[in-house]
């Protein structure tokens, strides 16, 4: 379902834990990390789509979270042609998104990456609030910055979270489909190093070293990074 300008209605999800860290998921079989997101089906409200995607992608139910806030308007990004399937090029332009900020009311063990037959992620971690800006694929970065900045106003009562993307960052070990495992630690990768680790066709986004987890399955170079 596209609007007249070629944008697909979509929801994005920023899930917080008790420390105001955000859920950060590794796309299955790839080196790329992102927030949960997905299209709004015909007849769905953004909130209904958010709860559906929340369960499909990370296995959580409405009782496991509470809504803290959402963006006021649609946030748009265009997708480069190399990430668009050939049959829809010329019609599909990108995504327009409503972003939801959720607070985890359940426990980490409530997160299930295999809740459906078509999982989106094969590992996940809690990351500091602004870390995704350093790791997300470039064409999504402006939307991530707009969403994180707009929704950060709901964090003003929680001084542990820097209210700018230039604060101190950190990360915890990542959780795989079958448990927890830590990635290499150390300084963040330079852009040159990140480029070397990306897939040859440029379809992968590479996190910093503190966020890196080896894929559990072979890397796919045919999937779009724009689900």
Swiss-Prot record:
Residues 6-149 form the Nudix hydrolase domain. Keywords: Hydrolase. Residues 192-201 have a biased composition (Low complexity). InterPro entries: Nudix_hydrolase, NUDIX_hydrolase-like_dom_sf, NUDIX_hydrolase_CS, NUDIX_hydrolase_dom, RppH. One of its GO terms (molecular function) is pyrophosphatase activity. Its EC number is 3.6.1.-. Its cofactor is a divalent metal cation. The keyword Hydrolase applies. A motif (Nudix box) lies at residues 38-59. Residues 165-227 are annotated as: Disordered. SUPFAM superfamilies: Nudix (SSF55811). Residues 217-227 have a biased composition (Polar residues). The keyword Hydrolase applies. Accelerates the degradation of transcripts by removing pyrophosphate from the 5'-end of triphosphorylated RNA, leading to a more labile monophosphorylated state that can stimulate subsequent ribonuclease cleavage. HAMAP family: Nudix_RppH. Belongs to the Nudix hydrolase family. RppH subfamily. This is RNA pyrophosphohydrolase.
């Amino acid at each position: 379902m596209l609007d007249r300008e070629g944008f697909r209605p979509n929801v994005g999800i920023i899930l917080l834990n008790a420390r105001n860290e955000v859920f950060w998921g590794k796309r299955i079989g790839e080196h790329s990390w992102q927030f949960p997101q997905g299209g709004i089906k015909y007849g769905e409200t953004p909130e209904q789509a958010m709860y559906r995607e929340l369960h499909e992608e990370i296995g959580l139910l409405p009782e496991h979270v509470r809504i803290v806030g959402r963006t006021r308007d649609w946030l748009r990004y265009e997708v480069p042609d190399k990430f668009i399937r050939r049959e829809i090029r010329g019609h599909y332009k990108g995504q327009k998104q409503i972003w939801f900020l959720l607070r985890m009311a359940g426990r980490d063990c409530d997160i299930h990456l295999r809740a459906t037959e078509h999982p989106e992620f094969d590992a996940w971690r809690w990351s500091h609030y602004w870390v995704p800006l350093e790791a997300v694929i470039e064409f999504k970065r402006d939307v991530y910055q707009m969403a994180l900045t707009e929704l950060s106003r709901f964090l003003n009562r929680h001084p542990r979270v820097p209210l700018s993307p230039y604060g101190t960052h950190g990360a915890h070990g990542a959780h795989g489909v079958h448990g927890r495992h830590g990635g290499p630690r150390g300084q963040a990768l330079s852009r040159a190093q990140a480029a070397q680790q990306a897939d040859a066709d440029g379809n992968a986004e590479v996190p910093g070293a503190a966020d890196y987890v080896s894929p559990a399955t072979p890397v796919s170079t045919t999937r779009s990074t724009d689900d």
